[in-house]
C-alpha cells in the first residue's frame, strides 16, 4: 500500500456561491488522520468523482438532499483502498466504492461501501459508466423513456458521461439518435466514436433549424439534463406521447434569477396536455436504488462486449478539485471528470 501520509487534506465549503462557484467558495484544510474505531475502516481515496449535482449541495435551498454545511467536507463519490480495518468484512488493500468526499482519508462504518474485487481492471469506471452516471442513463432512458425501434431520441450534453451512455443505449435499442453538444470536436466524437446518427452544435446561430431538419419525424424521447435554449428548440418538435426523462438542469444550476424573455410555462403545459407527454424527473439513488444489480449486470456485459464506449478526463491532484469542478460547470470537460487523488499501489 505504500507509506501512509501523516496528514489528511480536505476541501471544505468556505462560503455559499451566489451564481457560479469561484475558488473562494472552497478552503483547503489539513488535519490528523483519524484512527478507526471498533467496526470501522480507514480509507485512502484514490479517485474522486466530480459531478454537476455537487453545485446543488453547495446551496442551502430545499432540495432532495441536505446541503453541505459551511466548513463541511465537499461531498463526492470515491474509489478508495482500505488502509486499516476493524471491520470483519474488509481487509487492508481492499478496493471499495464509497462517498468519502473531497479528502485524502476517511473513516467509514462500512455500511455505505461496495467492494470492487481484488484487482479491478478500471477502478475509476465505477464512478462513471459502471456507476452513478451510467445508472442514471440506463434507468432514465429504459424505464421512463421506454425506447422503441425506429423512434427518434434527442440527447443533450451528448459527450458527457450520462448523455454519451444514453445515446449508445438508444442505438442498441434501434433508435435514431440525435446528439447535442458544444463544439465541433465533441460532435465528431459523438458520431464517429459513440455512433450517434447526428450531432449538432448548440452554439450554432441556426441551431433550432438544424435540429428540426435532423428530426423530420419529430422527437419521441428527449433526455433532459441541461435545460435552457435547447429545450426551447425541442419543445415544438415533440410527438404525441413523447417521453422526457429529466435527470438534471445544468444550465440553471448557477442561476440567481429567471432567464429573460416571455413566460414559457403556459406553452410547456399546453404541449404536455395536448400531446399527452410524459415529463418525469427522477433522482437515481432514491428512485432506482433497488434496481442497481439489474443495471450492473447488463451494463457490465455491454462494456465487456465493447457495445458501450466510455471516455474519462482524469486530473491529477486533490489540490486541483475546485478549479476542475468550476470548469465542469462551464462545460469544459470532455467525458467523465475524475480527480486522481493518489496512486493505486
Q: Predicted segment positions?
A:
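C-terminal hydrophobic helical "lid"/dimerization subdomain
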Residues: 2-6, 286-345
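Glycine-rich beta-strand-centered segment in the early N-terminal region that forms part
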Residues: 32-50, 58-102
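NAD(P)H dinucleotide-binding glycine-rich loop of Rossmann-like/cofactor-binding domains
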Residues: 74-81, 92-157
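Short glycine-centered segments of the SAM/dcSAM-binding site in methyltransferase folds
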Residues: 95, 152, 176, 242-243, ...
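N-terminal Rossmann-like NAD(P) cofactor-binding module of classical short-chain dehydrogenase/reductase
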Residues: 97, 154, 200, 222-223
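Mid-domain Rossmann-like dinucleotide-binding core that forms the NAD(H)/NADP(H) cofactor-binding site
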Residues: 127-205
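Short amphipathic alpha-helix with an adjacent loop that forms part of the alpha/beta core around
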Residues: 206-216
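Glycine-rich phosphate-binding loop and adjacent beta-alpha segment
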Residues: 229-308, 341-345
Amino acid at each position: 500500500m505504500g507509506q501512509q501520509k501523516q496528514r489528511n487534506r480536505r476541501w471544505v465549503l468556505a462560503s455559499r456561491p451566489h451564481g457560479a462557484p469561484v475558488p473562494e467558495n472552497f478552503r483547503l484544510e489539513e488535519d490528523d488522520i483519524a484512527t478507526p474505531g471498533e467496526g470501522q475502516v480507514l480509507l485512502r481515496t484514490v479517485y474522486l468523482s466530480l459531478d454537476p449535482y455537487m453545485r446543488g449541495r453547495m446551496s442551502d435551498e430545499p432540495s432532495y438532499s441536505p446541503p453541505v454545511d459551511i466548513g463541511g467536507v465537499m461531498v463526492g463519490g470515491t474509489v478508495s483502498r482500505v488502509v486499516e480495518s476493524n471491520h470483519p468484512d474488509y481487509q487492508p488493500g481492499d478496493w471499495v466504492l464509497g462517498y468519502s468526499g473531497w479528502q485524502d482519508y476517511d473513516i467509514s462504518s462500512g455500511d455505505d461501501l461496495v467492494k470492487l474485487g481484488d484487482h479491478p481492471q478500471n477502478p475509476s469506471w465505477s464512478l462513471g459508466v459502471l456507476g452513478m452516471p451510467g445508472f442514471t442513463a440506463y434507468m432514465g432512458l429504459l424505464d421512463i423513456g421506454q425506447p422503441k425501434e425506429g423512434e427518434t431520441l434527442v440527447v443533450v450534453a451528448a459527450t458527457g458521461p450520462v448523455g454519451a451512455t444514453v445515446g449508445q443505449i438508444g442505438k442498441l435499442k434501434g433508435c435514431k439518435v440525435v446528439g447535442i453538444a458544444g463544439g465541433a470536436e465533441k460532435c465528431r466524437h459523438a458520431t464517429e466514436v459513440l455512433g450517434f446518427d447526428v450531432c449538432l452544435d448548440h452554439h450554432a446561430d441556426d441551431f433550432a433549424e438544424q435540429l428540426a431538419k435532423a428530426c423530420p419525424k419529430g422527437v419521441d424521447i428527449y433526455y433532459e439534463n441541461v435545460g435552457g435554449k435547447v429545450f426551447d428548440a425541442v419543445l415544438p418538435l415533440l410527438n404525441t406521447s413523447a417521453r422526457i426523462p429529466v435527470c438534471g438542469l445544468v444550465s440553471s444550476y448557477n442561476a440567481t434569477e429567471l432567464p429573460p424573455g416571455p413566460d414559457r410555462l403556459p406553452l410547456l403545459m399546453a404541449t404536455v396536455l395536448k400531446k399527452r407527454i410524459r415529463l418525469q424527473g427522477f433522482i437515481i439513488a432514491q428512485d432506482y436504488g433497488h434496481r442497481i444489480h439489474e443495471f450492473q449486470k447488463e451494463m457490465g456485459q455491454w462494456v465487456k462486449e465493447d457495445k458501450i464506449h466510455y471516455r474519462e478526463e482524469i486530473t491529477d491532484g486533490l489540490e486541483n478539485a475546485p478549479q476542475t469542478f468550476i470548469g465542469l460547470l462551464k462545460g469544459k470537460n470532455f467525458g467523465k471528470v475524475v480527480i486522481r487523488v493518489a496512486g493505486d499501489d
